[in-house]
Swiss-Prot record:
S-adenosyl-L-methionine binds at G31, G32, H33, D50, Y80, D95, Q102. This is Ribosomal RNA small subunit methyltransferase H. InterPro entries: RsmH, SAM-dep_MeTrfase_MraW_recog, SAM-dependent_MTases_sf. It is found in: Cytoplasm. GO terms for molecular function: rRNA (cytosine-N4-)-methyltransferase activity. It comes from Cytophaga hutchinsonii (strain ATCC 33406 / DSM 1761 / CIP 103989 / NBRC 15051 / NCIMB 9469 / D465).
Length: 298
C-alpha cells in the first residue's frame, strides 16, 4: 500500500497549472500527486518519473495521450525529457524520501520493524546495498555517513563498533544491525536512533542528496520562465538544499553576482514554506515531518 499523498492540495496548487501545459511528477510512487495534476489538465501532458519497479505497476491505468511514465531516477530528468521530445516544462513536483509501500515491504530492508536483508535499494537494478556499506566501508566512511546523513551523535563510536563486529561475522540483516545498535542507543530513544542510522544508510545507498542536487540544477534548465517548482521534503538535509538553491541559486554560500553587482538567482520563492496543519498530521503520520517549498523560475 502506498501512502496517502502529503500536502496534496497545496503542492498541486503551487504549480499554478495551465490546462494546456506540460508538467512533471518526479516521484510517481502511488500516483496520488499525478492523479491530482491530471484532473487539472485538458490538452496538457504529464510526465512522471520513478526508479522503483513496484511504483511502475501503479501507472498502468493512467497510460494514455496525456500521461507518460518514465522508469528512471529523477536525477536524469533533462536527458529523459529530451528523449521524449520535451525541451521545456511548465511545472515540476517532487515528493521526496521513502514511500510507505517501501517501508511496509519487509524484504526491501527499509524498516526497523522487520527482520530482513539489509537492502534499502529504491532501484533494485543497482548493485550497492546497505549490507555492502556496513561490511565494506572504512571506519572513516561509516563515521562520515552516520554523522552527515543520520546526524547520529555518537557516529564515531558506532562506526568503530560496526567495524569490530563485522570482523567476527558480516552484518547482513536488519535484526543483526539493530542488535549492535542497541548497545549505543540513548535509553528511551532507541527507535529514533535506529531510524537515524537507517536513514543514513538509505541516503548513501540511493545517493539521495546527490540526486536531489542534480534535479534542482537541471530544473532551472527544463522549466520555462514563470514555471513552478513544488518540492516536499522530509528532513532538514533535503529541505536545506531546496531552500538554499531557491534563495541563493546554489547549495552553499551566498548568491553569485555578475560584473554589475546584480544577483544571479534562477528562482524566486512563492510564499513561505508550508507545513501540514494539525489535522493532516493527525490523519497522516508521514506528514509530520513534511515541508513544502514552492518557487518560480525567473
Amino acid at each position: 500500500m502506498y501512502h496517502v499523498p502529503v500536502l496534496l492540495k497545496e503542492s498541486v496548487e503551487g504549480l499554478n497549472i495551465n490546462p494546456e501545459g506540460i508538467y512533471v511528477d518526479v516521484t510517481f510512487g502511488g500516483g496520488g500527486h499525478s492523479r491530482e495534476i491530471l484532473k487539472h489538465l485538458k490538452g496538457g501532458k504529464l510526465y512522471a518519473f520513478d526508479q522503483d519497479a513496484d511504483a511502475v505497476d501503479n501507472a498502468k491505468d493512467l497510460i494514455g495521450p496525456n500521461f507518460t511514465l518514465i522508469p528512471a531516477n529523477f536525477r536524469y530528468i533533462k536527458k529523459y525529457l529530451r528523449l521524449n521530445g520535451v525541451d521545456k516544462v511548465d511545472g515540476l513536483l517532487g515528493d521526496l524520501g521513502i514511500s510507505s509501500h517501501q517501508i511496509d515491504t519487509p524484504e526491501r530492508g527499509f524498516s526497523i520493524r522487520y527482520d530482513a536483508p539489509l537492502d534499502m535499494r529504491m532501484d533494485r537494478a543497482i548493485d550497492k546495498t546497505a549490507a555492502d556499506i556496513i561490511n565494506k566501508y572504512s571506519e572513516h566512511g561509516l563515521h562520515s555517513i552516520l554523522g552527515m546523513y543520520g546526524e547520529v551523535r555518537n557516529a564515531k563510536t558506532l562506526a568503530q563498533a560496526l567495524v569490530k563486529e563485522r570482523i567476527n561475522k558480516p552484518i547482513n540483516r536488519t535484526s543483526e544491525l539493530i542488535e549492535v545498535l542497541s548497545d549505543y542507543a540513548p535509553r528511551g530513544k532507541e527507535s529514533k536512533y535506529y531510524a537515524q542510522v537507517f536513514q543514513a544508510l538509505r541516503i548513501e545507498v540511493n545517493e539521495e542528496l546527490e540526486a536531489l542536487k542534480d534535479l534542482l540544477e537541471q530544473s532551472q534548465q527544463v522549466l520555462k520562465s514563470g514555471g513552478r517548482l513544488s518540492i516536499i521534503s522530509y528532513h532538514s538535509l533535503e529541505d536545506r538544499l531546496v531552500k538554499n538553491f531557491v534563495q541563493q541559486g546554489k547549495f552553499h554560500g551566498d548568491a553569485e553576482k555578475d560584473l554589475y553587482g546584480n544577483t544571479n538567482k534562477p528562482f524566486k520563492s512563492v510564499g513561505k514554506a508550508i507545513d501540514p496543519d494539525d489535522e493532516e498530521k493527525e490523519r497522516n503520520n508521514r506528514a509530520r515531518s513534511a515541508r513544502l517549498r514552492i518557487a518560480e523560475r525567473e
